[in-house]
Amino acid sequence: MAAITNNPDKEKALGLVLNQIERNFGKGSIMRLGDAARMKVETISTGALTLDLALGGGLPMGRVVEIYGPESSGKTTLALHAIAEVQKAGGVAAFVDAEHALDPTYSAALGVDINNLLVAQPDTGESALEIVDQLVRSAAVDVVVIDSVAALVPRAEIEGEMGDTQVGLQARLMSKALRKIAGNIGKSGCVVIFLNQLRQKIGITYGSPEVTTGGTALKFYASVRLDIRRIQTLKKGSEGEYGIRAKVKVAKNKVAPPFRIAEFDIIFGQGISRMGCMLDLAEQSDVVLRKGAWYSYNGDNISQGRDNAVKYLEENPKIAETIEQQVREKLELGSLSFAISQGDGEEEE
């Protein structure tokens, strides 16, 4: 192979062309990768510590995320928890309610500041995606949730007759919208979360017959895809059902190792059980030990049974905080905080 020498003329020519590109296309349009202000991708918490660990820290900012699964599996609950975490950090959140099914009371119970949550309920898919595009372009919103892709009905389908056949309209709409939105998402640092439903393909003999709606464009543009399933119904004696156990598989992850699995409890009317997640990770990292049905911490038995252990942590917040700190240190989860961009370009630590 021929030797490549460092020629001063080449360096000068490179400097000139880089300056010309920046003048033509704006500052930051081209750069050396090592010159980037932040090489590390910032993340936001999902509200479930077990899922944050599986994702390598949380949902990546400036990326597209898809959450899909069967009905009543926890998709909207997970998205609302992400909104609540962003708002707690001082960020701005928007919810595009294409299904017209957002429950303000439930959202508030999950910790969402409904007084400051931006909500849009568009009539057509074009309107919904145009709203998303404008919110992303503003660089003033930190997370946008679209609920759901299946409800993004093209205008032509709405204006047509009920029996009309409209082939591939929604897939073409999603493909065009994502081409427009993707670049702006990276520049603005906004997380765009698409919730999606599952359908069954007909005549499939081998492999899974399940397929997400809206074509394949979202699969390519999404940096993270989460497959959420309900695996168990939680019951408590005569009180009956009080929640579900959800399992999330990271089907795709461009910023951390994929195919990891996380489980957590979703309590009806309350959302993701934070203490339940923490107890699972504390047991996994040997901060809390379990022998049979008994849970112990620092050599002392704290409760018998998982439900009682969760209740103990809820009733003893100082001990729970200490355990959480030890879990984060052992699993290198960090604080999971993220910087919210301010108007002057400064960042909040």
From Swiss-Prot:
One of its GO terms (biological process) is DNA recombination. It is found in: Cytoplasm. Coiled coil: none annotated. One of its GO terms (cellular component) is cytosol. GO terms for molecular function: ATP binding; ATP hydrolysis activity; ATP-dependent DNA damage sensor activity; damaged DNA binding; single-stranded DNA binding. Its main location: cytoplasm. InterPro entries: AAA+_ATPase (IPR003593), DNA_recomb/repair_RecA (IPR013765), DNA_recomb/repair_RecA_CS (IPR020584), P-loop_NTPase (IPR027417), RecA-like_C (IPR049261), RecA-like_N (IPR049428), RecA_ATP-bd (IPR020588), RecA_C_sf (IPR023400). It comes from the Bacteria. ATP binds at residues 69-76. Keywords: ATP-binding, Cytoplasm, DNA damage, DNA recombination, DNA repair, DNA-binding, Nucleotide-binding, SOS response. HAMAP family: RecA. Belongs to the RecA family. Can catalyze the hydrolysis of ATP in the presence of single-stranded DNA, the ATP-dependent uptake of single-stranded DNA by duplex DNA, and the ATP-dependent hybridization of homologous single-stranded DNAs. It interacts with LexA causing its activation and leading to its autocatalytic cleavage. This is Protein RecA. It comes from Crocosphaera subtropica (strain ATCC 51142 / BH68).
